[in-house]
Amino acid sequence: EIAQCLVGSEMCIRDRYYLHYFTTETTKYHEALPDILKSYDPVTGLWPESPGYALGTVSMLLDIALMLKSNGIDIIADNPVMQKAALAVFPWIDEQCNLIVFGDSRGGSANFTMFENLLTYYTLTKDEDNIKKIAAALNMGINSGNYNRSKSNWTGLCTYVRSIPQVENIETERMSYSAHHRMITMKNYNGNNKMMALLYGGKKGYHLSANGLAMQLYGFGYALAPDAAGYESYWSADVTYHQSATGSNTIMPGYTEGEIKINAMEPMVDSLSYTNSKELNPYINFADVTAGEKRRMVATIRTSDETGYYLDLFRSNLDNNDYLYHNLGTSLSLYTKSNKELKLTSVEDLGVTYSKGYDYFANPRKISYKDDFMVHWKNDKSPISMCMWMLGAENREIYQVDAPYTTLNKALTPGEVSTPPSFTPTLVVRQNSNAWTKPFIGIFEPVKNNKKSVESVTALHTENNFIGLIVASTNGKKDYLLHSIDNQPHHLKGNLSFSGNFSLIREKEGQIEMLYLGNGSLLKKGNYTIEATNNAYVSIYKNNGTWYYSSDSEVNVVLAGKKIHLSAGYNQEITF
């Protein structure tokens, strides 16, 4: 605010004395721009706090920058981190241009004034690539109803470009990672049904939260599995729930905050980048993260332009574990794998609790159940809902509870569900045994009008260091999902072998059309093989009848019995 006053004074009286104290010299009363910008991460361009704070500061700086640019002073060009900070918002917005929610952030639409200022700046500097990127964001906000340009103030009337260019959809980053925030975002916008997931650790300070090793899942433009942010204020009693791991999708007790370790990630984000620069194929994202005694792998898996699902594989090396999962909706129902509804019994409470946030779980219902089951979160106010399939394990109890509403912002939920005074239908899967050797394994599919594309989820192997399952879809596709944590070869019936972190083999009507190997050295099924000397990231996939491959190193493959040696490369056609 002091900086804005200094620049405003300079503009009024045309005296460069004030401008010097903004652009160059810090005093004991204020910081000049170079010192302000030292708070931004030089790699990501992010401010160290939660999204509302992280992106609000750069917006004010851009207001100043545009005033100065119109007077011949370009502080953006002179301070490259400022441009990086302005563009850092993109991985942290969803397809409706709403900010992601974590820490004490409440979400809501991105700052479109910032985008307008950027569009003016890039128009003045004739930066065509960034003009397209910013114009696409503004059009997205207008089309989603989040932004109305006609309500701009007089400053906008004087400084905004006359009209926003109509541009084709721009390519969206597939993966981003901020080590400071312990936040990974995954996006797959390669179809009409845009997919997005968040995987993140907890952190105290910087307006961040001890939220555990948490996950959020998106569908049709909404965070359907959100992080709770409906607290009244920092000082209200409900902050105990909304700003703790109990309001997140995680496992309790155990890790709530601390360093995380990335075991594997694809598309990869290197240590000198904020987002990925390459990707193995258009269909899969995954990240495998360790935090304390927890380890979680989340994947987004596309099965067509219109369909896809998420995989959540969550381990906890404790003897008692509550898997917490909150989803927007008006109710939830549980079913056996043969689609018979499970009847839960009302109980007084959950018995053992692991934080004060449990006090906010109301109307608990319970069943002891060790087999596979399916859950449908229903929404009486919108056609958008969520389906979940979870593989069974011994020593499990399933609780259904009414958690507090998720947000105060009615625009962030389909049909305004899970906003005051309603609730958030929540699942608690309690495992009264170690969940490292018998992890929680879930498949999630956002659906519209109850039209599921996932037909069945079947276990191949669900214990110890190796997990295998099959996801069959209604379009005739069958995905073999394999995951291990020991880097050893594993062999299953059907001439199926695997060594690595994560892999997927896709068949359609019995014919293999994709092999994906994430941080591994062997993947084989029948007459199809990927083999590497050292762990590699490799994908072989068929598109419109043509085989393509991507690999970060040299590999040997076998396609339909034919041996081929492939050099490192991305999205290259395979010639036989």
Feature names for model-found ranges:
Residues 427-438, 445-576:
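Non-catalytic terminal regions with compositionally biased, polar/charged low complexity
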